[in-house]
Amino acid sequence: MYENKMNLEFVSKSQNEAFARVAVAAFIAQLDPTIDEISDVKTAVSEAVTNSIIHGYENKEDGVIKIEVEICDGEVTIEITDNGKGIEDIPKVMEPLYTSRPDLERSGMGFTVMETFMDGLLVESEKEKGTRVRMKKKFNILS
């Protein structure tokens, strides 16, 4: 059984979204993923971190975003957590094209993208306490 784990913590500045995406991609590179698999994970991480910054912290740059990545037998679990304002109605925000910020010309496709590119998605949130997004992706490991 192969296992590994990484933790990352950064402030909610939009510039850190690219860092988070690349850091997670570099960590999962040990599984020898395809370019498409790396791209899928980077996109999903980008969407989750962007949601934390824009919606959770409402672009305030003093929030903290935590990422935990765990590898276990070819399955990667990525957990992205913020202590932002939380989500009141999770089923509603997970509907395609729903956006709470139409003023920002957001597409409302973040959770749809995460669901499409990953093998599993779980969103947990509590009003005024924050949100946790847990995503899973399976990789074929060559022995």
Swiss-Prot record:
UniProt keyword Cell division, yes or no: no
- Reaction(s) catalysed (UniProt annotation): L-seryl-[protein] + ATP = O-phospho-L-seryl-[protein] + ADP + H(+); L-threonyl-[protein] + ATP = O-phospho-L-threonyl-[protein] + ADP + H(+)
Q: Which residues cross the membrane?
A: none
Q: What is its EC number?
A: 2.7.11.1
Q: Which domain of life is it from?
A: Bacteria
Q: Which GO terms describe its molecular function?
A: ATP binding; protein serine kinase activity; protein serine/threonine kinase activity; sigma factor antagonist activity
PANTHER family xref list: ANTI-SIGMA-F FACTOR RSBW (PTHR35526:SF3), ANTI-SIGMA-F FACTOR RSBW-RELATED (PTHR35526)
Q: Which family does it belong to?
A: Belongs to the anti-sigma-factor family.
Q: What does this protein do?
A: Binds to sigma F and blocks its ability to form an RNA polymerase holoenzyme (E-sigma F). Phosphorylates SpoIIAA on a serine residue. This phosphorylation may enable SpoIIAA to act as an anti-anti-sigma factor that counteracts SpoIIAB and thus releases sigma F from inhibition.
Alphabetical list of HAMAP family matching this protein? Anti_sigma_F
Protein's recorded name: Anti-sigma F factor
Q: What is the lineage of its organism?
A: Bacteria, Bacillati, Bacillota, Clostridia, Eubacteriales
Provide the gene name from the record: spoIIAB
